[in-house]
Amino acid sequence: MKITLLTKAYGAYRGRLLETIRSEISIMITELDATLISIGTDRKNRIVVNIEGEDEEFVSNALAKEYGKSLLSDDLSPNTVYPGRFVDVGKVGYGLYVDIGVIDSPKMDALVPLHKIREQLNLLAPLKSITEAFVLADYLPVEVILTNIDLYNNRIEAEFDQKVIARVKEWLHDDHERLLVFGANQRQIEGKLKKSGHREDIYEIEQLGKFEFSLRCKRSTRASGILAAIGPRLRGVPMHLFIPKELLAMQNA
């Protein structure tokens, strides 16, 4: 049985991330009649595993619960919340696309239109300014509510779930700067922080997705300093600065 998960493995450490998942699945199926035949990714970097055995259906359900599940377009429902990740940020100016895991059509990402983004974030800035300031970047996990489903034209429209807006507001009014790190596991991040002598400068490591993390800096620590320290040690790993003061200045401009 081939299973496509919502979790993605990507970037310079794609192989290591796949090995992380392989190890976790191997532990999961130790006492079951199931064998992990293969693990890899599809064209959108979603993890694809092949499981065989009497318990493959049980394992499939367990994997979907742990790592998120893929969908068929016919199963989509309006006014329903779906988890996903931003894709192709910056490639168009009319909105942001979110990969919610539809696997039977390569072009069925959910579009959050620019007017809806402006309305929900209470901003009138250009899309590029909004995405850069709020770090709405590729691979950032988000939840969206589907508002319109047009299967004939392969078009889905959505808006951000309140969880996303609440997270943005929480970060915005928090006086801790953040460094977002995508495409690494927590052990890697912890290790690089310790080697660079900066683990004590991080107040909290928040897990946003399986391989997506927010490093919440101590009040006396600048996120740019952490980026300079661990960036060279994790080459090829996307990292983004979230600076509340800069965002507030933008909102008040």
Predicted regions and their residues:
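OB-fold/S1-family RNA-binding modules
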Residues: M1-G68, I130-A253
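S1/OB-fold single-stranded RNA-binding interface
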Residues: R46-E52, E56-T147
